[in-house]
Amino acid sequence: MKKNRMMIMICSVGVVWMLLVGGSYGEQCGRQAGGALCPGGNCCSQFGWCGSTTDYCGKDCQSQCGGPSPAPTDLSALISRSTFDQVLKHRNDGACPAKGFYTYDAFIAAAKAYPSFGNTGDTATRKREIAAFLGQTSHETTGGWATAPDGPYAWGYCFVRERNPSAYCSATPQFPCAPGQQYYGRGPIQISWNYNYGQCGRAIGVDLLNKPDLVATDSVISFKSALWFWMTAQSPKPSSHDVITSRWTPSSADVAARRLPGYGTVTNIINGGLECGRGQDSRVQDRIGFFKRYCDLLGVGYGNNLDCYSQTPFGNSLFLSDLVTSQ
């Protein structure tokens, strides 16, 4: 009997040890769990477990390494209606097809579906994330030109729909294309392809596979589609949210690829395959121009690593199959 009890104790200790070092017993986060984030803003340790002590948030922490954020603040306390109108100054110009579509109220309403957005870190970090989100999406929807009134970076959010679109339909059994529908770029982030519409729709509770044009006709849904993309990690890519709020810790491979926390890595996430690792690039410069203007209007510094000129692009995958959303 004593021998049996001793064997049980040894087995129990072994199981606990395997859990601590990251064995195959249901890890909670990080690469061991498909890129999942810890609930409550907790840190993900190198072994894939959630917590808030230095064992989790210290060396080799994978994500959300700053620990839980302070109590959430309503986004309107960080960006007022008048500042929003100044940031997107010419979005309602008569020459912009999006005139009247991208409203402040729709932005604030959509952000409530993602309470971590603009609510992670200190006030400067929160404002910088708002500037980064609006900067990247302004590049995607810009109607500006070099000699435009108030400069090229005052013309974000001029377009809702992609110009010269195609169907963007890929045969996938999980998210089949609906008859007669096209999945071209729409909304602030210009979401495209049927599998992205399908997964986004599932996340926000709207049938975007059958009704993709809701992204171009319902302004709250439109902003939600962009925030879904922003808050969602796609392995091996972290989420833009985690990068800009410094909750992402680059791996040794990321460091070797010069992918470090900052606005430049967000550009890499969004369009690195076409824009990053090519030296000076006018598209990257345009994204930075919007970001700097918006940071100035919000009264916050730019942070480090603004470009991706020397970064190796993240590995591209066709399907967003392992998505984890920060909420």
Swiss-Prot record:
Matching PROSITE patterns: CHIT_BIND_I_1, CHIT_BIND_I_2, CHITINASE_19_1, CHITINASE_19_2
Keywords from the named record: Carbohydrate metabolism, Chitin degradation, Chitin-binding, Disulfide bond, Glycosidase, Hydrolase, Plant defense, Polysaccharide degradation, Signal, Vacuole
Catalytic residues of the enzyme: 140
Cited SMART domains: ChtBD1
Residue stretch(es) of the prosequence: 317-327
GO cellular component: vacuole
Start and end residues of each Chitin-binding type-1 domain: 27-67
UniProt name for this protein: Endochitinase CH5B
Pfam families for the chain: Chitin_bind_1, Glyco_hydro_19
Organism for this UniProt entry: Phaseolus vulgaris (Kidney bean)
Localization, UniProt: Vacuole
InterPro entries found in the cross-reference section: Chitin-bd_1, Chitin-binding_1_CS, Endochitinase-like_sf, Glyco_hydro_19, Glyco_hydro_19_cat, Lysozyme-like_dom_sf
GO BP terms in the entry: cell wall macromolecule catabolic process; chitin catabolic process; defense response to fungus; polysaccharide catabolic process
EC number: 3.2.1.14
Cysteines engaged in disulfide bonds, as pairs: 29-44, 38-50, 43-57, 61-65, 96-158, 169-177, 276-308
Keyword Signal among record annotations: yes
The reaction(s) this protein catalyses: Random endo-hydrolysis of N-acetyl-beta-D-glucosaminide (1->4)-beta-linkages in chitin and chitodextrins
GO molecular function: chitin binding; endochitinase activity
N-terminal signal peptide: 1-26
Function: Defense against chitin-containing fungal pathogens.
Family of this protein: Belongs to the glycosyl hydrolase 19 family. Chitinase class I subfamily.
